């Protein structure tokens, strides 16, 4: 399967089912009471991190995901079934961004972790809900609310315990193959590795293991998008321990400076990670030159381990050093997960706009109209769109309890003025407050 670590998708949660407007019917009962049931909740869209998946490629064929709607309520107080939640399985290390706001909406760093990224709509209430001592046969019910829709960008940042970073042809793939059971493409030319490759490294006694990633070779300017650029730097941010793989036959100290410059430019916190230096291809130089290079690298304050991926020299020591230095996985995950930004549920503030409409007949006074926006009133009107006339009394009492009439009075509304909320119009009476 091809490797893909960025994917744009669209998700839509299910709509809530409408409540039922129904009355009980029986053979010997001419006028039964209201018995409309509630609509079901719409299904939500949920991201779920699973094992055994290392790429977003499996989602490429389906870019749009829609959860089922809730079922309508029915008579005899039967509630509509909830829509099933839709799960999108992704690799551990997947981050989801809202493409419109750019905010982080999910960051899945553990197997089994879930996050709702589009919430299903609420089911509407049936007419049985609206019975009162003075309203014993309500001929209206509530509509379900729409499910959330979102444009989402998925970015995979592989969660490997150890990341091998270095310039092209430094021997990272050979080192990964020598230490683990991975089988990367290996050749003596740059950019053999074009996507991250994971391997599993076991301790000498086979009791412990960790994952190691061969990250594609860095070039100067990678943090600005040159070469493979951000396509691989993203994955380095997830590793608990960095191994700088340097070719002893080149200029290791200068290459390490450039590597750290690129990492610092992309994300300064990367240089705070636990790290060591694997001085590779040690079989190609004599002992004196190797010792001199080690002395030059001492200024960086990192452990230096001379190794040869080709002959196996120094590999047992490198393996043990990695096990000794690895930070605790759970503690690291808790402190390095991206912070999900809380959902903002902000209700638009109430605003009243006054206008005068031209009279229908010459000589008549213009119609005084108050437009109502915000305060949640428009959303409530929409939920009774099919039965606005029958629900007028209920809505009028609801708006009174929620302070609309007091707000109109303070704004200067007069007896008989028209109040307009979307398509719903009614007359204002001073005694309503």
UniProtKB/Swiss-Prot annotation:
- Cross-referenced PANTHER family, in alphabetical order? DEVELOPMENTALLY REGULATED GTP-BINDING PROTEIN-RELATED, MITOCHONDRIAL RIBOSOME-ASSOCIATED GTPASE 2
One Pfam family per UniProt: GTP1_OBG
- CDD domains for the chain: Obg
* PROSITE patterns assigned to the protein according to its UniProt record, in alphabetical order: G_OBG, GTP1_OBG, OBG, OCT
Q: What is this protein called?
A: GTPase Obg
Q: What is the first-listed, main subcellular location in coarse terms?
A: cytoplasm
Protein function: An essential GTPase which binds GTP, GDP and possibly (p)ppGpp with moderate affinity, with high nucleotide exchange rates and a fairly low GTP hydrolysis rate. Plays a role in control of the cell cycle, stress response, ribosome biogenesis and in those bacteria that undergo differentiation, in morphogenesis control.
What family, per the record?
A: Belongs to the TRAFAC class OBG-HflX-like GTPase superfamily. OBG GTPase family.
Q: Which cysteines are joined by disulfide bonds?
A: none
Q: What class of enzyme is it?
A: hydrolase
Q: Is Zinc included in the keywords of this UniProt record?
A: no
Tagged with keyword Transmembrane helix: no
Task: Give the protein's cofactors.
Answer: Mg(2+)
Q: Name one GO molecular function term.
A: ATP binding
Q: Which InterPro entries match?
A: G_OBG (IPR031167), GTP-bd (IPR006073), GTP-bd_Obg/CgtA (IPR014100), GTP-bd_prot_GTP1/OBG_C_sf (IPR036346), GTP1-OBG_CS (IPR006074), GTP1_OBG_dom (IPR006169), GTP1_OBG_dom_sf (IPR036726), OBG_GTPase (IPR045086)
- Which HAMAP family does the record cross-reference, listed alphabetically? GTPase_Obg (MF_01454)
Subunit and partners: Monomer.
What domain of life? Bacteria
**Compartments, as annotated in UniProt:** Cytoplasm
Q: Tell me its EC number(s), please.
A: 3.6.5.-
Annotated Obg domain residues: 1-159
Q: Where does ATP bind?
A: 166-173, 191-195, 214-217, 280-283, 308-310
Taxon lineage: Bacteria, Thermotogati, Deinococcota, Deinococci, Deinococcales
- Cross-referenced Gene3D superfamilies: GTP-binding protein OBG, C-terminal domain, GTP1/OBG domain, P-loop containing nucleotide triphosphate hydrolases
A single cellular component GO annotation: cytoplasm
Q: Where does Mg(2+) bind?
A: 173, 193
